[in-house]
Amino acid sequence: GDAAKGANVAKSCGTCHSFEQGGAKKQGPNLFGITTRGPGKAEGFNYSPSYKAAAAKGFAWDAATLQDYITDPTAFLSNKTGDAAARDKMTFKLAKPDERADVIAYLATLK
């Protein structure tokens, strides 16, 4: 992916997320450092019960996991938890594979 293009695509995510170190929590957690911290570790953010259950199963925010999550957050949580009713606050999906790759490349620079 192209991190510069990803920064542009991620602007649409800025409604719910911040991207700078120490950035405010919004509807979604601050994504600064997401690839270097464990799931559910954004300071001060109240994660959904389904997200907490998935995080308890253990995973890392590597490129493949981010790809699965931003493709369909609800399906990701259902698969991780084994609960078809699992839901998250994030319902936005990035449909285009190239945009997902670009956003993932951008997120990897935030550390």
Curated annotation (Swiss-Prot):
Tell me which domain of life the UniProt entry assigns to the organism this sequence originates from: Bacteria
In its UniProt entry, the species of origin is given as Novispirillum itersonii
Question: Does the record's keyword annotation contain Cell division?
Answer: no
Q: Residues of the signal sequence?
A: none
What are the recorded GO MF terms, alphabetically? electron transfer activity; heme binding; metal ion binding
**Pfam families in the record:** Cytochrom_C
**Keywords assigned by UniProt?**
Electron transport, Heme, Iron, Metal-binding, Transport
Q: Does the keyword Lipid biosynthesis apply?
A: no
Q: Which residues bind heme c?
A: 13, 16-17, 90
PTM characteristics: Binds 1 heme c group covalently per subunit.
What's the name of the protein? Answer: Cytochrome c-550
